[in-house]
Amino acid sequence: MTAAPTAPPTSEDIAAIRARMPRAFGMTKPRRARAIAGWLAGGAWLVTLLWWFDITPMRIWNGLSGLLTIVRLMFPPSPGAQWADILQGMAESVAMAFLGTFAALVIAIPLGFLGARNVVVNALAHFSLRRAFDGLRGIDQLIWALTFVRAVGLGPLAGVLAICAAEIAVLAKLFAEAIENADARQGEAIAAVGGSGLLRIRYGLLPQVLPVMLSQFLYQFESNTRSASILGVVGAGGIGLQIAERIKVRYWDQVLFIILLIFATVAVIDALSSRVRGKLIGAG
């Protein structure tokens, strides 16, 4: 028994199949033209940027040659005669990172609750606060450091304030998202027995999100330890000042020693904070 012949597809059938699987039919002429125009525009923009910044193969080659000379002068690494100042600067950077991140944590916790949609239900207030977080997150720590150096003078206080100002919005946004993702049933149970809004936050939301908050604090502290090493370049204290001074006088062996010290310090903090974060998340 032979199968009945299948009717050829109509133009409507072909159009429907093309709409569902456009890649199976290849690119249409208008789409191909748009793709070519996009590639040409991207290439023209790239060439324009290379011309604007005067990026040439000769400049790159000369720069790499100079970099190789500096790398050769870095070995062997040496702390020099002022190794105590280097260690003090490293300890100062770690302390700046901790104090700045901790101050940001204290301020960001209430802001995180205010920015959470399940705590503040007013759409305008929620939108305004979230956009404020986004705006503050766009300001780099170095800009804050330059501002606070001018306001309070040289030294670690400017670095602490810069880290704090830069981290408040970052932590507040992370906290708000964690609060919004918390299980609402605990808060609903507290509200069902007559608990106030503050009690719902204290006993329904905070126990769930506190481990996440502390984990984020540790992660940002680790990240800010690296950032604090750079803030000293603009006068905000820490090991960055030691790096800047030695680069000026071209003590490249001491520069490498400081870089290795920063690497070791960050590695130790990373290992410790990773273990603590794992326990916090497991406990949460």
Each predicted region: which residue ranges?
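N-terminal, non-cleaved signal-anchor transmembrane helix
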Residues: 1-102, 109, 114, 118, ...
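Short helix-to-coil transition segments within interhelical loops
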Residues: 182-209, 236
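Transmembrane alpha-helices
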Residues: 197-231, 253-265, 269, 273
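Glycine-rich helix-loop "coupling/hinge" segments at transmembrane-helix boundaries
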Residues: 150, 226-262, 281-284
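Generic hydrophobic transmembrane alpha-helix motif, especially the helices
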Residues: 133-167
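Cytoplasmic-entry segments and transmembrane alpha-helices of multi-pass inner-membrane transporters
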Residues: 111-145, 174-177
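Membrane-embedded alpha-helices of multi-pass transport/permease systems
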Residues: 107-113, 143, 158-161, 165-179, ...
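Hydrophobic alpha-helical elements at and bordering transmembrane segments
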Residues: 71, 86, 90, 94, ...
